[in-house]
């Protein structure tokens, strides 16, 4: 391996590490503490995501958490797309989003106990292929209106979005990584799925655990 190849590998893995660290920022925990709402991990489901932050009763903090969790997936992808050719470096750009997503799920700052990845998943889609983000949002809103289940809406959205990408976006790497992200989201929702199956999953606006 020559010097240029070594530098390229160092550059690539440095980007992945930086993406992971950005994804690891626990905005939900930080914002609830700054707003003196307590430790969000001790509220509701114990999740650090926007849905659980909403259970504090502070809609502004929940909205801010949602936006920041989305943006940390979007920004890293857009920055790398700006610095690299989107066609020649599609696998690197896809992996950058994946590492940011993994950071949210397994943040180093919280002993690798993070969120469920829905907002960051959406953010990665928005940065890499915005029509996928639009499909995700439409599906989520539609099923949320029908069911009032945030978790079920997210699960259906992460199943339908990769199918849409498969038929509309001709990049195998991007599709494979999106499928892996969907699998992670589904696994992270295993408790929600169990409650849905026995009819004990709570809907938005109730006091029981949701996400």
UniProtKB/Swiss-Prot annotation:
InterPro entries: G3P_acylTferase_PlsY. GO terms for cellular component: plasma membrane. It is an enzyme of class 2 (transferase). It is found in: Cell inner membrane. It catalyses: an acyl phosphate + sn-glycerol 3-phosphate = a 1-acyl-sn-glycero-3-phosphate + phosphate. It comes from the Bacteria. It holds the Pfam family G3P_acyltransf. The keyword Transmembrane helix applies. Probably interacts with PlsX. Catalyzes the transfer of an acyl group from acyl-phosphate (acyl-PO(4)) to glycerol-3-phosphate (G3P) to form lysophosphatidic acid (LPA). This enzyme utilizes acyl-phosphate as fatty acyl donor, but not acyl-CoA or acyl-ACP. This is Glycerol-3-phosphate acyltransferase. It comes from Bartonella quintana (strain Toulouse) (Rochalimaea quintana).
